[in-house]
Amino acid sequence: MTELLVGTRKGLFVLEGEPGAGFSIRTRAFVGDPVDYAMRDPRTGRLFAAVTSPFWGPRIWFTDDLGEEWQSARGVALPRGGSDALKRVWVIVAGEDAGRLYAGGDPGVLFESRDDGETWELNRALWEHPTRPRWRRDSGGLSVHSIAPWPGDPQRLALAISAGGVWLTEDGGETWAHGNEGIVAGYLPEEARATAIDLCVHHLERAPRRPERLFLQFHGGVYRSDDAGRTWTDIAAGLPHDFGFPVVLDPADPNSAYVIPVTTTDRVTDGRVAVWETRDAGATWTPQDEGLPLKDAYLSVLRQSFAATGEGPSLQLYFGATSGEIFGSGDAGATWFGVAQRLPAIASVRPA
């Protein structure tokens, strides 16, 4: 049985089913409130939800049982007395040692928990980084939205910030270094590109079987790094558009990546929906669209709304749209089926 945690503008939906056999809504939570992200810690089974209440603001909630009450985590806040306010928590990721999790949000913040998500602490080194005044808010805010731990090494971490570029640490977040070399911000004046820090990275993922390899969807470009994020190569040639938001990998194949290209102007699929796949590290791309809408389909898929579970030929892929539809594949993208319709606008999809 596959569980889908679906964060929407009007609450959390938990779906259950099997590829090709249908999915149904098991339960809902935080009805009426925006749920920006939800995940289940694969180590403990604990569920987490990032909820932005119009009354209480952004919080992280957790529960060990969907049938029990959710508890509010402590410490998800910015220092008192400052001019900034916490606006959103966009992502929660399990770390590489027991009890550790990370959460990223707006305005360009990273939180860390060492007690299975019950309490959190702000990463001061990133918050107080001297380049922060040069970071820039984009249409989605100023957000830490991608967090990529290094398998087996809790000291190494890669982050993506929109719009603040790629950041790397090798000492558990005590210090941070930029990882922007090779990324070309075509939307900036040419004379500003070489020194720009405020790069609009849309999503970043690490290949778990070859952790020095990362894939990145940019604001105009799809990139690959083979040196742990220090330098990047554009691999977008062959795609119908180089603009998009999510990127997903097959854990079994470090040469794999999946993207959903959208138009630059209105940021939706251009009439037909296709997931584009590479199995040669971006040298070539192939559209995978059997079972997807191929006519008059203008979908917007946000960066956290495309995810995978499993690996290899039985890799399951799921993506949701702001129009409330979810599509899935049980065979690594070869064929697709409808999972759900008429949900509220979807912000995140995570299978467990």
Annotate each PLM feature:
Residues 1-352:
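Extracellular glycan-interacting surfaces
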